[in-house]
């Protein structure tokens, strides 16, 4: 992760002057849906550094849209919606192909503070027509995409991105920057935010009211996520080096799932580095299929830690594939065993951790080796899986099947690339 981004999220310092070098990139594992994707890499050059990133959750052509958030030091940040250029008509004779344009901007709005996270509203099927998304920075903000009546129904025409609501805790005078948030998949009226003031706040986004605020950690909270398919349970990580689990039905207590181990003593008997005692944990991700598993990582660490909340205390796996600090982790939305991580070594690594869908599953040493890696042109700071387009988001992890996996990654040089791979997964003899 770029140091100036990490510093802003962690300490609220001013970013460095290297902001104009950041890149944004989109990633996927290659299969051509209905002949749609013709190239290995699709690129979008953002006009500013990018950190916030999320695929649309709606099905159909709208699944090709990305929400993109800038991260610059002035109060002049932007939220942008881009889309793959004319996906239904992308052929060798199209205007976009001849002009070498892969993505087009369809909406943009001002967002004063840097965007620490952006998410589209969870989709539950049906004929819902609202197009909502949310961001964090100074506040939790809800946005709506409004189509121009003259262009209604025309794909990729310019639309309006308007602020629907700004959620503020009226009981708090000081506005502490928000480091992250999550939107509940079962009850889309619920969202939870994390802040550098050590708190997490649960919101009702329909009423705009804070349901509860709690002191979650001893120091800054850097990330928060709902337990998959639960409305009352969420976990957080922070500067105190711990992963904590909370239940909204019993907030008097929390469960510490993991704490940074103390530093190993040197030969002289003293600790080698006392600062390691509270090495911050920066991000976490719940497994979307087998929710007992959490992926997280320490600041300035090359290792991804896998935890099982049924067995707190020690990691069930430690994934070592990066050669520079890890910046992001995200489980596949369609396969319990697939995880992707990105780092300062310019790699987005895909891991196959074996069958985690059954109770008491274990991760063998065999599964702690990378399955494959995408080599980017600069540091990978963020990633997101595409979930809704039928041939894009579905992972068919079965014997000898061609498997398409699609996601997106944010880089350090202002570009967005859609990258594709075609892989085959075989049954292996696992010890």
Predicted feature descriptions by range:
Residues 66-72, 132-136, 191-195, 234-238, ...:
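Conserved beta-strand element within WD40/beta-propeller blades
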Residues 44-50, 108-115, 162-178, 215-221, ...:
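WD40/WD-repeat beta-propeller blade N-cap
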Residues 49, 62, 114, 177, ...:
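WD40/WD-repeat beta-propeller blade-loop signature
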Residues 55-63, 119-129, 182-188, 225-232, ...:
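Loop/turn segments within WD40 beta-propeller blades
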Residues 85, 146-148, 205-208, 248-251, ...:
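Short loop/turn segments that connect beta-strands within beta-propeller blades
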Residues 147-185:
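Asp-box/WD-like beta-propeller blade repeats and closely related beta-sheet repeat scaffolds
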Residues 2-8, 12, 20-44, 58-108, ...:
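Beta-propeller domains
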Residues 73-80, 138-141, 179, 197-201, ...:
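Short coil/turn segments within WD40 beta-propeller repeats
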């Amino acid at each position: 992760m770029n140091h100036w981004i990490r510093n802003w999220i962690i300490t609220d310092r001013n970013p460095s002057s290297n902001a104009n070098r950041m890149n944004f990139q989109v990633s996927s594992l290659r299969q051509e849906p209905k002949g749609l994707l013709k190239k290995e890499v699709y690129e979008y050059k953002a006009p500013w550094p990018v950190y916030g990133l999320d695929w649309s959750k709606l099905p159909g052509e709208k699944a090709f849209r990305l929400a993109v958030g800038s991260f610059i030091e002035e109060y002049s940040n932007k939220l942008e919606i881009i889309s793959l250029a004319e996906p239904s008509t992308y052929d060798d004779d199209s205007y976009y192909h001849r002009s070498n344009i892969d993505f087009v901007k369809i909406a943009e709005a001002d967002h004063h503070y840097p965007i620490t996270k952006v998410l589209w509203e969870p989709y539950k099927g049906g004929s819902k027509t609202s197009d909502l998304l949310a961001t964090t920075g100074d506040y939790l903000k809800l946005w709506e995409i409004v189509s121009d009546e003259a262009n209604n129904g025309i794909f990729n025409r310019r639309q309006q991105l308007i602020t629907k609501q700004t959620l503020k805790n009226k009981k708090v005078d000081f506005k502490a920057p928000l480091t992250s948030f999550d939107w509940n998949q079962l009850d889309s009226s619920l969202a939870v935010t994390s802040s550098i003031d050590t708190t997490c706040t649960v919101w009702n986004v329909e009423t705009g009211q804070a349901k509860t605020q709690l002191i979650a950690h001893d120091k800054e909270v850097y990330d928060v996520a709902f337990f998959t398919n639960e409305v009352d349970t969420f976990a957080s990580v922070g500067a105190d080096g711990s992963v904590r689990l909370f239940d909204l039905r019993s907030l008097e207590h929390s469960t510490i799932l993991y704490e940074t181990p103390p530093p190993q003593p040197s030969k002289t008997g003293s600790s080698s580095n006392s600062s390691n005692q509270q090495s911050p944990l920066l991000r976490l991700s719940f497994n979307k299929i087998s929710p007992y598993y959490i992926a997280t990582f320490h600041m300035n660490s090359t290792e991804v830690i896998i935890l099982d909340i049924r067995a707190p205390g020690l990691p069930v796996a430690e994934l070592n594939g990066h050669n520079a600090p890890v910046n992001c982790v995200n489980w596949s939305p369609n396969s319990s065993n697939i995880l992707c991580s990105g780092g300062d070594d310019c790699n987005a690594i895909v891991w196959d951790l074996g069958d985690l869908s059954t109770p008491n599953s274990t991760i063998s040493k065999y599964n702690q080796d990378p399955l494959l890696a995408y080599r980017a042109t600069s540091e990978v700071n963020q990633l997101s899986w595409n979930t809704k387009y039928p041939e894009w988001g579905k992972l068919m992890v079965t014997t000898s099947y061609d498997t398409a996996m699609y996601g997106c990654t944010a880089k350090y040089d202002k570009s967005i690339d859609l990258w594709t791979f075609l892989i085959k997964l075989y049954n292996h003899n696992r010890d």
